[in-house]
Amino acid sequence: MEIKKYFFYALFFLLFFCLFLSKLQAYKFNMSIVGKVSSYTKFGFNNQRYQPSKDIYPTGSYTSLLGELNLSMGLYKGLRAEVGAMMAALPYDSTAYQGNNIPNGQPGSRTDPFGAGIFWQYIGWYAGHSGLQVQKPRLAMVHNAFLSYNYKKDKFSFGVKGGRYDAEEYDWFTSYTQGVEGFVKYKDTRLRVMYSDARASASSDWFWYFGRYYTSGKALMVADLKYEKDNLKINPYFYAIFQRMYAPGINITYDTNPNFNNKGFRFVGTFVGFFPIFATPANQNDIILFQQVPLGKSGQTYFFRTRFYYNKWQFGGSVYKNIGNANGDIGIYGDPLGYNIWTNSIYDAEINNIVGADVINGFLYVGSQYRGFSWKILGRWTDSPRADERSLALFLSYFSNKYNIRMDLKLEYYGNITKKGYCIGYCGMYVPVDPNGPGTQPLTHNVYSDRSHIMFNITYGFRIY
């Protein structure tokens, strides 16, 4: 009888809810409930035990699971609201048996209560709102919770959004922000300002709760002015991490065929310049996980990219150059490259040396697509004072429109030579007599590490309403 009673309660609620929605349609109300589930695996071919005394620094492997649900509502004439939540899990972590040399009492050490391995630093990492005090991992978050309003009349429009939401179309900021932004646009020119109180990585390969870990406990503000007409886009901007960094920059892009639809020819050329000025002492180290290079007083980033399209084929190349430690405070949680730069090793900095101090990178790629299948081959050459890297990667992707399933596979050869005088991992920790014990010390010679790996991601999307 109890089951029958609750069934009728649920049926009554459903009928009432449907009637309520039908009435709201007259007021321009609309709603959707969508979600996805995904699994991500990175498997490093260098899967030996961690033995720094023998110059063995493995890559590490892990598998994560992610579930997501989002409710989106169009409330009334340009007013929208969205709320969504995510939950992650870490079913496999190779570092549980590969070991590490983190001192006892520190996050990730042998006595760490958070887990037998250290990949919780990727899936679940939480260091409080400040981003500076490591706490118990968080495997669930409300990543979307915002209100937005957009108004448009003739050639004039403006909009505002506040809460937690996915930050879009920023050269040096990606993923989710907790904050507010607004824009004003007239004809082909738009002014936009964003204030970010905290940032979150919300994906199947990285799951970090909202915090200020990427700005050393400070807030971030961005202002950009974009002019876009026909084939040309000119986008000057300014990024500020208060009391730490101030950075003007510009993106200039020329596109011969903005409405390209896989037929004919298209060329897209992009130049990005970024010029951070640091307000911290010149000898203070960067926040990149290397933490081995002083920030200095200023830096420069120059990025040139060419992309060619012919029917379903594409090819091109790019050059990325840092003068000084330009990305020491920004450029690691968002960059204009368009490539995943977090593919190194958990035993070093997972981030590549692509954004290191005084680095120069070259990229070449070719690819094509057929129906739901696409492929790409990407080669990378990286030289920097800290490390040199060579990489050749094959990307395969397939999307089934019928079943709403996407599969992505990457197979990458990746070699890294870390140079004498630098550390693989954190420098400056206590180093005992045991060379495999706690602590990391500068290398006495160059060390080659195989960072080759395979990545596989499968995602199923669904719609409830």
Q: Model-found features: residue ranges?
A:
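Residues on the lipid-exposed face of transmembrane beta-strands in outer-membrane beta-barrel proteins
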Residues: 67-73, 145-151, 180-184, 223-229, ...
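Extracellular loop and loop/strand-boundary signature of outer-membrane beta-barrel proteins
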Residues: 52-57, 131-133, 165-168, 208-212, ...
